[in-house]
Design a protein with these regions (language model features):
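Conserved beta-alpha-beta core of the PfkB/ribokinase-like small-molecule kinase fold
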Residues: 155-232, 251-253
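Short beta-strand scaffold segments in enzyme catalytic cores
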Residues: 117-121, 252-255
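Short gly/ser/thr-rich secondary-structure transition/capping motifs
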Residues: 100-102, 135-142, 193-198, 226-227
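Hydrophobic beta-strand scaffold residues
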Residues: 79, 105, 186-187, 244
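A short, aliphatic-rich alpha-helical micro-motif
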Residues: 149-151, 207-208, 238
Length: 334
């Protein structure tokens, strides 16, 4: 196995995307813009209701950190993804898709069980609401992870969705220890307002004594710090991380590195589907930092890539699109 720049740990999920009405979300008690966990029976029931009454848009490999890793690799970075899938059709499809995107995986990720699924419900305002059955990924342990690539990586990336799993949190703890012992920087994302609201203790455990780079959106930042303004939230987040990146949807992003803080405006697009936008942002930002492009260029690239994800259905762009976007940003920032 060759060395990689990015070692990511996250859930492995197959997305089923639907266009839905606001009334459908209300009727099924789904809070718009958040992720809700479900068991297999509830997932199957919702899927049948969706197929019967809403508009099906297709299936795609998902998982927050996986989407981030795909963006990182598609831009030219080398990456490894640690996850857990079932020994079923969806599991093999999932790992094959990562390998096709140039991402290294291990057969240790495959075990008996059912691969997780996520119903991605896109409302008329393009916001995504997720109903997730984690399946076997809820039982991710260090036994499914080959930590060797982490010892020589430059970045460890951890998704906040893992906060709901005790075994996954233990695996993250081990990954953090290996990263620190080998001088690997740690990036973390809060992932979702629901994680902040319902799994705060798990997030705190994984962030532990701090990280090098923290990603969150505006709502997550305010909720996690229990503040009313971004300025106040940023002051508290600086206690946890050197780099802070707060995304603000169409308004762009706020970037902080020690004493330097600046904002980069968003890109105007016709929003279709917000699913995966934050993930793509993180992947592009990490790639740019990793190759030494600087914070402002990293933010410009991340905003451009994520804006293109928002302008289409599905959490990932075609691999061929990333190189063109990188070229555009480098030309603009020259």
């Amino acid at each position: 196995m060759s060395t990689v720049d990015l070692f990511a740990i996250g859930n492995a999920l197959i997305d089923q995307e639907f266009k839905v009405s606001d009334e459908f979300l209300t009727a099924h008690h789904l809070q718009k813009g958040t992720m809700q966990l479900a068991d297999g029976e509830a997932q199957a029931t919702l899927y049948q209701n969706l197929k019967a009454t809403q508009t099906y848009k297709g299936q795609a490999s998902g998982g927050s950190a996986a989407n981030t890793t795909v963006a990182f690799a598609a831009l030219g970075g080398s990456a490894f993804y640690a996850c857990r899938v079932g020994n079923d059709d969806l599991g093999h499809i999932y790992l094959h898709g990562l390998n096709e995107a140039g991402i290294q995986t291990t057969t240790q990720s495959i075990s008996e069980g059912v691969t997780g699924t996520c119903m991605v419900l896109v409302s008329p305002d393009s916001e995504r609401t997720m109903h997730t059955y984690l399946g076997i990924t809820a039982e991710l342990t260090d036994e499914q992870i080959d930590f060797q690539p982490l010892t020589t990586a430059k970045w460890l990336y951890i998704e906040g969705y893992l906060s709901t799993s005790e075994t996954a949190r233990q695996a993250v703890k081990q990954a953090r220890e290996i990263a620190k012992a080998n001088g690997v920087k740690i990036a973390f994302t809060l992932s979702d307002p629901a994680m902040v609201q319902y799994a705060r203790a798990g997030l705190d455990e994984m962030i532990a004594d701090g990280v090098d780079l923290l990603f969150c959106n505006q709502q997550e930042a305010l909720m996690y710090t229990e503040t009313d303004t971004i300025e106040a939230a940023l002051a508290k987040l600086k206690e946890l991380s050197q780099y802070i990146v707060i995304t603000m949807s169409a308004d762009g992003a706020l970037i902080s590195n020690n004493g330097e803080t600046f904002t980069v405006p968003g890109r105007a697009v016709t929003a279709v589907d917000a699913n995966g936008a934050g993930d793509a942002f993180a992947g592009a930002f990490l790639y740019a930092l990793n190759v030494g492009l600087g914070l402002k260029t990293a933010a410009e690239l991340a905003i451009l890539v994520s804006s293109q994800v928002v302008a289409q259905f599905g959490p990932r762009l075609a691999v061929s699109e990333y190189a063109a976007l990188l070229k555009d940003v480098l030309k603009e920032c020259a």
